[in-house]
Amino acid sequence: MGKPFFTLSLSSLCLLLLSSACFAITSSKFNECQLNNLNALEPDHRVESEGGLIETWNSQHPELQCAGVTVSKRTLNRNGSHLPSYLPYPQMIIVVQGKGAIGFAFPGCPETFEKPQQQSSRRGSRSQQQLQDSHQKIRHFNEGDVLVIPLGVPYWTYNTGDEPVVAISPLDTSNFNNQLDQNPRVFYLAGNPDIEHPETMQQQQQQKSHGGRKQGQHRQQEEEGGSVLSGFSKHFLAQSFNTNEDTAEKLRSPDDERKQIVTVEGGLSVISPKWQEQEDEDEDEDEEYGRTPSYPPRRPSHGKHEDDEDEDEEEDQPRPDHPPQRPSRPEQQEPRGRGCQTRNGVEENICTMKLHENIARPSRADFYNPKAGRISTLNSLTLPALRQFGLSAQYVVLYRNGIYSPDWNLNANSVTMTRGKGRVRVVNCQGNAVFDGELRRGQLLVVPQNPAVAEQGGEQGLEYVVFKTHHNAVSSYIKDVFRVIPSEVLSNSYNLGQSQVRQLKYQGNSGPLVNP
């Protein structure tokens, strides 16, 4: 008779302990955002490579722990290439300067860019057949483009322009798909990269500080960095990839000192319509002037920024609030679902998913005041892939002394990165200004969910981007709240006369942008 009671009591005790543990974890997470003071953060760590620079923010800052993100900034010099890597969480990249190319390696997707086999002949020898190259689609990006990187998918980037590419990336370490902890990690497939987030390594060292000599040697190897291939022996790699040991040793890259960003001597040559079009133009010019066409240059020159935007607009699907500026292509107008002509739905969603959108074009603005500035919003409604990432973005340009009126985030934390200089004020639930100061270029500011925030441009204006931790982040503007509340409620709430209430509700701009 006592056994069922004992079993029930034991089950109840386990359930109580589990509930207490979950409550403690949840409470700890909530307490991370009980911040009485916010700080403008600057990069804490730099990794200088052969072809560029990587700057990172310490993820242990209370503000970043509250938002569940960390941030990195990459600078790719001319002909600089960021080595293939992947992350255990999604990331969003905004290009604040320059132009380039990005390639992904989606698992299970075909190589849709192919170079046909060609016959090459040499004097005194028979014709030889060159090996064929093929790879997945390459996407081109420009200044103002927002790129989204799926978790676990390898990608690489390359600077195709003459000026450095500068890109800022929030890393959503608290994403529910990340089965590790919230410490930032980058898994490189090539090179001998340096540690980008030393705080992660420091925590691991503290956890292993009680280990013996063997663990100490292991920690020393971890501090030196390396790609995921460097942990395998060259003999094993040679067997796995069916190659010789010399090639396998280069895959391990034990002595490569170029680090994360390398310089491609002579420029990168890949299969891409954009590369090929420029090469054909160069050959046509040579024939026109009677010159013998030379071999295609390895480093392509590229068209103007407007040409890149036109290409992006052709690839974009029409948005309800932004109709296309040119007619759709015939293949886009054909109805789908006709028997065998229907393409694989999984392939369309994964292999050909749209992963970038320009957010900085003036024609892209959702709010505009010719005397105050403009606002552009990017969320899962305008870029459906963001629904899987749980991120969104907002691009704001404030003209001289222009004001972004007070608002708050209903369902997201936000990370603000500036390109100019302006004043920001954040007020918490107690009516205290947890931040009231100037935000300069290169700094970031984390604003938790619900505190009211307002921005004002300086004498030279203010340009900034806001990353938000929800795929469809919603903001509520205090001016809009005044408009929808009955006059009597406002009169009694603020002790105002009717004329003052009418002035408060209906005088001035109806949108969030204000010119003082």
Curated annotation (Swiss-Prot):
**SMART domains in UniProt:** Cupin_1 (SM00835)
Where does the secretion signal sit in this chain?
Answer: 1-24
Q: Which GO terms describe its cellular component?
A: aleurone grain; endoplasmic reticulum; protein storage vacuole
Keywords from the UniProt entry: Allergen, Disulfide bond, Endoplasmic reticulum, Glycoprotein, Seed storage protein, Signal, Storage protein, Vacuole
Q: Where on this protein are sugars attached? A: N79
Residue ranges, annotated region (Disordered):
113-135, 198-226, 244-345
Regions of biased composition (Basic and acidic residues) lie at 247-260, 317-337
Where's the Cupin type-1 domain?
38-249, 357-502
Q: What does this protein do?
A: Glycinin is the major seed storage protein of soybean. Glycinin basic peptides (GBPs), and, to a lower extent, glycinin exhibit antibacterial activity against Gram-negative and Gram-positive bacteria (e.g. L.monocytogenes, B.subtilis, E.coli and S.enteritidis) by forming pores and aggregating in transmembranes, leading to membrane permeability and, eventually, cell death.
Subunit note: Hexamer; each subunit is composed of an acidic and a basic chain derived from a single precursor and linked by a disulfide bond.
Know the name of this protein? Glycinin G5
